[in-house]
Amino acid sequence: SRTKRTYRMDRSREHTAAFTGHRRYDGECDDALRAVVRELYGRGFRVFWSGMALGFDLAAAEAVLALRGELPGLRLCCAVPFPGQADRFPEADRLRYMRILDRADEVATLAPRYEPRCYLRRDEFMVERSAAVVAWFDGGKGGTRYTWDYARRCKAERINLWCDGQQELF
């Protein structure tokens, strides 16, 4: 059953992974994304966090949901930086977002309203709870770079699907 909480920290980090990636994502690595979820599941990972941004985050959440039928105990948790995150999304993506939240095992809403740095706090929240971070990262500046670097500082395993797993490229 799904729970919606403002904050929860009762999971084992070693069995948890998070996703980060660019908003410009058109399914380029969907097969690799599903494969890495299966691989991590085989290594004991059961909980996957999505920050629910446009692009890679939504695709990653959908990949976890699609695999729940074949991977018992697989859980999707969504870290929502503030209510209304999707208000400015295109309508089709806003509907995807709502469908994902409805099917998520847990939704953590981290701030009552938009605040400066709320997206970075969301990224820190996910990384601090994760032993691995799966990325769609081209090496550029921005939120994905911040999360990628923060994962390194937190000693999380980093898997970059952009460069076929050669995560130390960036």
Predicted segments with their positions:
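Acidic/glycine-enriched connector segments
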Residues: 7-170
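Extreme N-terminal basic, low-complexity initiation segments
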Residues: 2-6
